[in-house]
């Protein structure tokens, strides 16, 4: 039995309503898509204030009011037509579009799947005018200068599409994410958000650093690096999060091109590559970056959502972004946004409130109290906090009076910059005094070692105050950079072992050692089979000669077996070198004398990106004299 041939249907043009609904399938994917399109229109109209009202996650209602230029009365019906816009009028303007919107299909697409009412007023109008999309009726209305777009009952006429919507909270989350992107891109615009009649978010117009802290929270604000780079027509600015601010998800990655939020694989790869020396594994960097370039150098007419772009010279853009972020991470050594930062409030300030010195002190005490489980002082914790929160603030001082009697480095060592090489190591019972760095802090920014704490940390003094160094993490970074430099130059020095280290190996490990012998030679290893079940390590890189040879060999063979020789050297090189450096770095409880500690500090100063270990953790932190004064409540 054969299936009946369906009757041929004639070719005919589709009705405008159906065309708009088809287009809406791409433009209006969910309530968040409506929010995005309306926010872009408001910003293109010059709005500086945005009021957003949502109901039931935006499914029942989305109303956005702006104070932009408004729409003239005679243009209101045209605004609801498909492909009607004031933003472009020729192909030349399309190729150099500088506005967020330009297609002229958003309002028509939204009106085809929801009940839309548009109310607008220009500065020349005596009153506002309203148009109802479903009927086309135009009538006078109340309202100030600007525009209100009220969208209700999304997908009321396409129930099949409505079934694909998620829960109210999920849709609300997507709407808020779009609003957050807008808030980060335009800190000069005040934004308020209400959901189901209750206030949800409010951001006053502010500087970029304050807006970023308000939107992304104090955790990111305390670990961000502000920077700005320019090269020719390219300019990149914003905030790159320190590796310590990395996250398990890529939910704090915001990249803007000419003010437009984009998701571009080229840009994401450039930023990720810049972090590869300090962030391995499954962690994602956090950042808010803005790229500016001539509009004609980027094509934004790639996808209906306008979230994808193409660059005229993609290679140049990639290299510029990569080097700019990499330089920012290298340049801000030691600025790890540690927990003693007091310039970022834990909660947003009330509108119009001005912080006083006493407020700053109280905030700092509250932050410290939240981190301390107990206080090693006589009075009870509650009484102490009550006393401190009611106390006066310390007066700022760049150099307290009590430091006037501290001898300088020149006086302490009769003009010598450091202790002689043949000086006897300091005894634990009476440690030698460390040279004090001069105020310029140029020669030795990490200062000079004073003591070792618990066999883990090196305590040093510099012109700013006190430096704490994690000696294992710091040594790990030094070894990593030396290994990386040697591998790039194909000059890894090899240390033959007087007695080869043998160990039982699996058939896979033995096969890997035989297959990737050339790669092992390049890495500085001599690993070969001495029996069907035994491998021997006869040489290791000189930099790693103190490490466990068996553990090193197993790690290298595991990576080679998993990824192959060429991929290990191309894509997994940094991870492999980080593992090797970790094996050979100085371990905890290794006692160092002052000469060894100072040698570590000098190596750190000469090493690129020495402020972060290979896993993204800080290698040192700076506590200024002002920080120490606050800890001991001096000057209050």
From Swiss-Prot:
Residues 332-360, 417-443 are annotated as: Disordered. Gene3D superfamilies: 3.30.230.10, Histidine kinase-like ATPase, C-terminal domain, MutL, C-terminal domain, dimerisation subdomain, MutL, C-terminal domain, regulatory subdomain. GO terms for molecular function: ATP binding; ATP hydrolysis activity; ATP-dependent DNA damage sensor activity; mismatched DNA binding. InterPro entries: DNA_mismatch_repair_CS, DNA_mismatch_repair_MutL, DNA_mismatch_S5_2-like, HATPase_C_sf, MutL/Mlh/PMS, MutL/Mlh/Pms-like, MutL_C, MutL_C_dimsub. GO terms for cellular component: mismatch repair complex. One of its GO terms (biological process) is mismatch repair. It holds the Pfam family MutL_C. SUPFAM superfamilies: ATPase domain of HSP90 chaperone/DNA topoisomerase II/histidine kinase, DNA mismatch repair protein MutL, Ribosomal protein S5 domain 2-like. Residues 417-437 have a biased composition (Low complexity). Keywords: DNA damage, DNA repair. Residues 332-344 have a biased composition (Basic and acidic residues). HAMAP family: DNA_mis_repair. PANTHER family: DNA MISMATCH REPAIR PROTEIN MLH, PMS, MUTL, DNA MISMATCH REPAIR PROTEIN MLH1. This protein is involved in the repair of mismatches in DNA. It is required for dam-dependent methyl-directed DNA mismatch repair. May act as a 'molecular matchmaker', a protein that promotes the formation of a stable complex between two or more DNA-binding proteins in an ATP-dependent manner without itself being part of a final effector complex. Belongs to the DNA mismatch repair MutL/HexB family. This is DNA mismatch repair protein MutL. The lineage of its organism: Bacteria, Pseudomonadati, Pseudomonadota, Betaproteobacteria, Burkholderiales.
């Amino acid at each position: 039995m054969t299936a009946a041939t369906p009757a041929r249907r004639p070719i005919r043009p589709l009705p405008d309503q159906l065309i708009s609904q088809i287009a809406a399938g791409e433009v209006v994917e969910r309530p968040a898509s409506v929010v995005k399109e309306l926010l872009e229109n408001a910003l293109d109209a010059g709005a500086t204030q945005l009021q957003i009202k949502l109901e039931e996650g935006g499914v029942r209602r989305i109303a956005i009011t702006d104070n932009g230029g408004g729409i003239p009365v005679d243009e209101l019906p045209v605004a609801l037509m498909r492909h009607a816009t004031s933003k472009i009028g020729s192909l030349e303007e399309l190729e150099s579009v500088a506005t967020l919107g330009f297609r002229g299909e958003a309002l028509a697409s939204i009106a085809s799947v929801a009940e839309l009412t548009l109310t607008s007023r220009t500065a020349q109008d005596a009153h506002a005018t309203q148009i109802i999309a479903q009927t086309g009726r135009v009538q006078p209305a109340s309202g100030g200068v600007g525009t209100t777009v009220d969208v209700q009952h999304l997908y009321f006429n396409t129930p099949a599409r409505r079934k694909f919507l998620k829960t109210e909270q999920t849709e609300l989350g997507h709407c808020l994410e779009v609003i957050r992107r807008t808030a980060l891109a335009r800190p000069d615009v005040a934004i308020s958000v209400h959901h189901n009649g209750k206030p949800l978010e409010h951001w006053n117009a502010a500087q970029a650093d304050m807006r970023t802290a308000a939107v992304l929270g104090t955790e990111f604000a305390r670990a961000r690096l502000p920077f700005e780079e320019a090269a020719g027509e390219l300019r990149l600015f914003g905030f790159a999060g320190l590796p310590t601010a990395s996250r398990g998800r890529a939910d704090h990655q915001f990249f803007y091109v000419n003010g437009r939020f984009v998701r571009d694989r080229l840009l994401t790869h450039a930023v990720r590559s810049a972090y590869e020396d300090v962030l391995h594994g499954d962690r994602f960097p956090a950042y808010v970056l803005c790229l500016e370039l001539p509009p004609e150098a980027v094509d934004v007419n790639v996808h209906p959502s306008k979230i994808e772009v193409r660059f005229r010279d993609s290679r140049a853009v990639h290299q510029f972004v990569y080097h700019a972020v990499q330089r920012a991470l290298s340049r801000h050594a030691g600025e790890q946004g540690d927990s003693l930062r007091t310039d970022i409030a834990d909660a947003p300030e009330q509108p119009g409130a001005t912080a006083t010195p006493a407020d700053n002190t109280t905030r700092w005490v509250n932050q410290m109290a939240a981190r301390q489980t107990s206080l090693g002082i006589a009075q009870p914790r509650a009484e102490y906090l009550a006393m401190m929160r009611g106390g006066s603030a310390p007066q700022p001082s760049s150099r307290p009076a009590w430091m006037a009697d501290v001898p300088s480095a020149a006086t302490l060592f009769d003009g010598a910059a450091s202790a002689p090489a043949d000086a006897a190591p300091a005894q634990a019972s009476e440690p030698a005094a460390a040279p004090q760095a001069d105020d310029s802090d140029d020669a030795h920014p990490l200062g000079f070692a004073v003591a070792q704490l618990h066999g883990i940390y090196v305590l040093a003094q510099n012109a700013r105050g006190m430096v704490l160094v994690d000696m294992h993490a710091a040594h790990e970074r030094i070894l990593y950079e030396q290994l990386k430099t040697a591998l790039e130059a194909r000059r890894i020095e090899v240390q033959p072992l007087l007695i080869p280290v043998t160990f039982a190996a699996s058939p896979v490990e033995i096969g890997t050692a035989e297959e990737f012998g050339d790669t092992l030679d390049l890495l500085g290893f001599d690993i070969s089979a001495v029996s069907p079940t035994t491998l021997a390590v006869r040489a290791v890189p000189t930099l790693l000669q103190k490490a466990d040879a068996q553990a090193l060999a197993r790690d290298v063979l595991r990576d080679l077996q998993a990824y192959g020789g060429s991929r290990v050297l191309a894509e997994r090189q940094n991870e492999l070198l980080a593992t090797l450096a970790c094996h050979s770095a100085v371990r905890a409880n290794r006692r160092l004398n002052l000469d060894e500690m100072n040698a570590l500090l000098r190596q750190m100063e000469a090493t690129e990106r020495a402020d972060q270990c290979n896993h993204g953790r800080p290698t040192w932190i700076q506590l200024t004299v002002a920080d120490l004064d606050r800890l001991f409540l001096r000057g209050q």
